[in-house]
Amino acid sequence: MNTLDFVDQASLRDDIPTFSPGDTVNVHVKVIEGSKERIQVFKGVVIRRQGGGISETFTVRKESYGVGVERTFPVHSPNIDHIDVLTRGDVRRAKLYYLRELRGKKAKIKEKR
């Protein structure tokens, strides 16, 4: 192991639940506005997980007032308070970019049994 691995190991979080693309999650993000800090919830479908180690990221997509919103989060970010997995999705792809073109019921993902 080199020196960077030791530094990265100290920054890794161990309270992250296991989730994969297709899962619906609530990401509780710490937002700082001026001197106040609050928790903002971003609920959506995980469309990708990418990378590994300290640089691992995941992207969550949701529809807000008819407009698609995607947000990418580092998995081990200190700005993430916690992640709740609401439903497990049954998908056959690792990257769900095809959901960007789908609207309404066609964008639904089957739930795992």
From Swiss-Prot:
Keywords: Ribonucleoprotein, Ribosomal protein. GO terms for molecular function: structural constituent of ribosome. GO terms for cellular component: cytosolic large ribosomal subunit. Gene3D superfamilies: 2.30.30.790. InterPro entries: Ribosomal_bL19, Ribosomal_bL19_CS, Ribosomal_bL19_sf, Translation_prot_SH3-like_sf. GO terms for biological process: translation. Disulfide bonds: none annotated. Belongs to the bacterial ribosomal protein bL19 family. This protein is located at the 30S-50S ribosomal subunit interface and may play a role in the structure and function of the aminoacyl-tRNA binding site. This is Large ribosomal subunit protein bL19. It comes from Mycolicibacterium smegmatis (strain ATCC 700084 / mc(2)155).
